[in-house]
Amino acid sequence: EILIGLVGSEMCIRDRFTQEAEFARNVIVCDGAYEPEKFYAIAKGLEKEPERGRRCYKCYELRLEETARYAKEHGFDIFTTTLSISPHKNAAWLNEIGERMAEKYGVAYLYSDFKKKNGYAHSIELSREYHLYRQDYCGCIYSRLEREEQKKNKRI
């Protein structure tokens, strides 16, 4: 059985993913609480950091700790993150944090770098096949604003 947990307490778009993820059999979608104050607390002072910067590291810590805690509380044997499929995410950081949280909570962490072996391209194909929503920013407001600025500058 697979559980998909939406852990990004700061995610701007949640409902669409939750509805679309219900497509798969044997997949349970667990929508974590929307608690943006947790994200804003760890992002304080890092608002101007670019994607892949220190703000992202702190966000990875927040997400993976919440995931590991949930896994422990609900009797899961292992946890991981799909964030490593993105070419914009630092898989080394994700895995280092995941291993640390595994040790802290006593739940195994599945090392991941899903973008390898054409994983990112395959994810795009699967998204098309299953008509899944794909956004072009990580989900936090700062990343969204950065992406909007990049798009605006490309039009000029």
Please tell me what each predicted stretch does:
Residues 1-15:
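Single conserved hydrophobic/aromatic residue that forms the stacking wall/gate
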Residues 12, 56-59, 140:
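Short cysteine clusters
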Residues 24-41:
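A conserved beta-strand->alpha-helix junction
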Residues 48-116:
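Active-site adenylate/phosphate-handling loop in enzymes that bind or generate adenylated species
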